Amino acid sequence: MDNSGKQAEAMALLAEAERKVKNSQSFFSGLFGGSSKIEEACEIYARAANMFKMAKNWSAAGNAFCQAAQLHLQLQSKHDAATCFVDAGNAFKKADPQEAINCLMRAIEIYTDMGRFTIAAKHHISIAEIYETELVDVEKAIAHYEQSADYYKGEESNSSANKCLLKVAGYAAQLEQYQKAIDIYEQVGTSAMDSPLLKYSAKDYFFKAALCHFCIDMLNAKLAVQKYEELFPAFSDSRECKLMKKLLEAHEEQNVDSYTEAVKEYDSISRLDQWLTTMLLRIKKTIQGDEEDLR
């Protein structure tokens, strides 16, 4: 069946679901089990939504899932309603990101009301990702990652909470909210130190915290590096710590060439990502007579 055939079938199912809802409101249905007609309508709306999905009519699919969700709420089937709102959100993601967020927020309300905080956290991440990629609103993405981290922490899912917090730290630093980023990197770095599995990544978090300190003030960065070396001796031997010391020295001497050379040398072994490049360029700009490029 081609898309137009699926679309037509979906429209027919919608009409059937609407008839069921109308019939459930009649006087006789009220006496003889109107709720079973509503249940049938829920099912038919969901079938229509899936048919719209097959026809790639994402908005219509989202609307049909929303209709099913509203009816589930009428029947006090909270879990089913939340599931339909999530399905609606996923359909709207492809057509109307703001509407996707609205549907996911409805689902989150239901899940938090039911005490299902882990699943609510997961949907806050989905909303944060829509703000990151579709709507490009970093402040709102941060807010949803923070909310997600709070819920995960409350449920003792610390590694999931830390993943969200690291997203917050990355964006906070980009927005020049350095102290906020430092607090998170230090907190996550300290907890990683105590885990045999995560120990290796602690140096990266202390490195990022040190770079944020450097963006505020060179002396801050110097003291931070000393603190991290005492706290986590393995940091001293890391390439990240050695790079920090070279950068501090270059900055102290106001030597752009040795700063660039140190970055180049590091980049030849560990490729710089976009975040590190941004931070290193910001620091480089505080050296007199800098040029725009890092390498």
From Swiss-Prot:
Q: What is its main location?
A: membrane
Location comes to: Cell membrane
List the GO biological process terms: apical protein localization; brain development; intracellular protein transport; neuron differentiation; regulation of synaptic vesicle priming; SNARE complex disassembly; synaptic transmission, glutamatergic; synaptic vesicle priming
Membrane topology per the entry is: Peripheral membrane protein
Phosphoserine PTM positions read 26, 29, 195
Please name the GO terms that the record assigns under molecular function. Answer: protein-containing complex binding; SNARE binding; syntaxin binding
InterPro entries, A to Z: NSF_attach, TPR-like_helical_dom_sf
Q: Does the keyword Cell wall biogenesis/degradation apply?
A: no
List N-acetylmethionine occurrences by residue.
1
Question: Which UniProt key words apply to this protein?
Answer: Acetylation, Cell membrane, ER-Golgi transport, Membrane, Phosphoprotein, Protein transport, Transport
Locate the coiled-coil region(s) and give their ranges: none
Q: Does the keyword Protein transport apply?
A: yes
User: GO CC annotations?
Assistant: glutamatergic synapse; myelin sheath; neuromuscular junction; postsynapse; presynaptic active zone membrane; synaptobrevin 2-SNAP-25-syntaxin-1a complex
Primary role: Required for vesicular transport between the endoplasmic reticulum and the Golgi apparatus. Together with GNA12 promotes CDH5 localization to plasma membrane.
Q: Which family does it belong to?
A: Belongs to the SNAP family.
The record's subunit annotation is: Interacts with PRKCABP, and disrupts the interaction between GRIA2 and PRKCABP, leading to the internalization of GRIA2. Found in a complex with VAMP8. Component of a SNARE-like complex that contains at least ZW10, USE1L, RINT1, STX18 and NAPA/SNAP-alpha. Interacts with VTI1A. Interacts with STX12. Interacts with GNA12 (via N-terminus); the interaction promotes CDH5 localization to plasma membrane.
PANTHER family documented for this protein:
ALPHA-SOLUBLE NSF ATTACHMENT PROTEIN, SOLUBLE NSF ATTACHMENT PROTEIN SNAP
Protein name in UniProt: Alpha-soluble NSF attachment protein
What is this protein's gene name? Napa
